[in-house]
Amino acid sequence: TLARQLANTSETAVEKLKSRLREARAVHCFALGAQDTALASLLQHQLLPAGIAINLCQDASLMRMTASTLSDDHLLLVLVTAEADTVLQSATLQARTQGVTIIALTPPQHALANMAADIIPLPDSPQLARYALLLLVDLLNDTLMA
């Protein structure tokens, strides 16, 4: 399944994400749920040595407050491997109205994919999505450190 995920992961999308991570004045990540917050925390810790500091929001109220302060020079990563609740969708929509660049790390048919400027597609299965995100973190680390 990792070989399939690697084949389905667009090199262009990874390069675009890498570029946006480097150019953004601030990077924020919204994630809710046990698996998603753990994966977002991993992403946060793995990208720090590359000089990418990610503000992780895993609280619904904090997401709304954060979304209201974002601007067009920020980057918002929205990580969802399963269904996103309405609070996460609402905070993402609020960030979108603020002009923030949003990249969704989610299955392509997910509602949050429609709110994003770009999407890094994850498999529908939460377990496979977890492996896909681990692969993405490794790809980002390899390209950011190079």
Q: For the regions a protein language model found, what residue spans apply to each?
A:
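HTH-adjacent hinge/linker in prokaryotic transcriptional regulators
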Residues: 1-13
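Membrane-interface junctions
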Residues: 8, 20-23
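Short, charged beta->alpha transition segments
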Residues: 11-17, 62-66
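Glycine-rich phosphate-binding loops that contact phosphosugars or nucleotide phosphates
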Residues: 23-145
